[in-house]
């Protein structure tokens, strides 16, 4: 498996920042009441990851080891500021909905963790791709959790997509059922904890199933090899 495939596998599944490392849970649990909010925060985090990883990789040989962490945090803060200003300019209503959790991207341990553990030790191409895959892995979890909570809480999917994608996205809204009052357990933080627990449990179940399938295939290969050897 080459490096790019390994980075994709690590970011999207095996070492997913939300489901495995359990990083960035504060914004993940707080703003994922809808798919749109989750997707908006996920894309913002992904842009910061790509930019900060690439920059850290470029200057990795110039930064004194003793002060590398403060410098990495300053780089991350700079990219968060850029993303914040862009959202303020082009997606203002979504910017207001996400509120304080956009600047709090600076404190996301997944970002500083990747800058320290990977970007500071690898070339820019690998570092940027690592940021992309980690960001996409985080975004997928945000979107799935947002979809679960929005569906159970409001009976809709992609409500408010126009806040992120423009007026044309208004037609993306899907109404599964109508309700006079939302299901509060789903749209409040307790529902986020329950939904996150279900996603983690589902991943663990799939991992164990894949391990059993792989073990069975390996055992079948060993038996086949032994049979061929015995026949010869």
UniProtKB/Swiss-Prot annotation:
- Record keywords, A-Z: Cell inner membrane, Cell membrane, Electron transport, Membrane, Translocase, Transmembrane, Transmembrane helix, Transport
- EC class (word): translocase
How does the protein's chain sit in the membrane according to the entry? Multi-pass membrane protein
Q: Provide the GO biological process annotations.
A: electron transport chain
Give Gene Ontology CC terms: plasma membrane
Pfam annotation, one family: Rnf-Nqr
Q: Which domain of life is it from?
A: Bacteria
Compartments annotated for it: namely: Cell inner membrane
**Member of which family?**
Belongs to the NqrDE/RnfAE family.
Report the protein name in the record: Ion-translocating oxidoreductase complex subunit E
- Organism equals Pseudoalteromonas atlantica (strain T6c / ATCC BAA-1087)
Lineage of source species? Bacteria, Pseudomonadati, Pseudomonadota, Gammaproteobacteria, Alteromonadales
